[in-house]
């Protein structure tokens, strides 16, 4: 009986592991990059915004979903979206395709899970270049996709490490 219980427990752990792995895989396939942060949510947001500014880019705004939920009497763990970009780079594509403005500027999400762990999630450069831009009839040269991906990685690393 004890062996049966151990086997059931092991099977349950394996199933949970597979579900988590599948969820992470789906997120990666959908162009999302998620990095764990070594800092509380508020500090991760501040570090991300400082990293954006250090690259000469602009932080346009924050959307604090937890604060909005609180205003209507609901509780939510931290969920803050940061809109950031570089008008020198982003304006021309939006002039060519007005609908790009629904997806631009890029966004980062700082969020806390049920265990209190903080994460930073953003669209990969590859996703932006191969999915977002073509969705609006635009193309992004492979070198620009690569450079954007590296920039986003650098920003995320500066915020989370």
Protein language model regions, located:
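Extracytoplasmic/secreted envelope proteins and their assembly/folding machinery
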Residues: 42-45, 49, 66, 145, ...
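N-terminal secretory signal peptides that target proteins for export/translocation
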Residues: 1-5
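Sec/Tat signal peptide C-region and signal peptidase I cleavage site
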Residues: 21-27
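C-terminal partner/receptor-binding element of secreted or periplasmic proteins
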Residues: 126-161
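Terminal, regulation- and interaction-focused segments at domain boundaries
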Residues: 27-58, 157-161
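Beta-strand/loop substructures that line and gate deep hydrophobic ligand-binding cavities in soluble
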Residues: 108-138
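Bacterial N-terminal signal peptides
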Residues: 9-21
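Compact, glycine-rich, soluble single-domain proteins
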Residues: 49, 53, 57-60, 64-106, ...
């Amino acid at each position: 009986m004890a062996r049966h219980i151990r086997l059931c427990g092991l099977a349950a752990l394996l199933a949970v592991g597979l579900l988590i792995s599948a969820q992470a895989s789906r997120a990666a396939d959908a162009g999302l990059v998620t990095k764990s942060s070594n800092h509380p949510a508020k500090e991760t947001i501040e570090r991300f915004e400082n990293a954006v500014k250090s690259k000469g880019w602009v932080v346009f705004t924050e959307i604090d979903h937890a604060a909005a939920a609180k205003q209507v009497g609901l509780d939510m763990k931290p969920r803050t979206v940061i809109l950031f970009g570089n008008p020198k780079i982003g304006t021309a594509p939006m002039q060519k395709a007005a609908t790009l403005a629904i997806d631009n500027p890029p966004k980062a999400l700082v969020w806390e899970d049920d265990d209190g762990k903080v994460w930073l999630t953003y669209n990969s450069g590859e996703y932006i270049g191969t999915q977002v831009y073509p969705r609006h009839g635009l193309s992004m040269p492979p070198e620009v996709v690569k450079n954007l991906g590296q920039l986003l990685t650098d920003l995320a690393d500066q915020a989370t490490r």
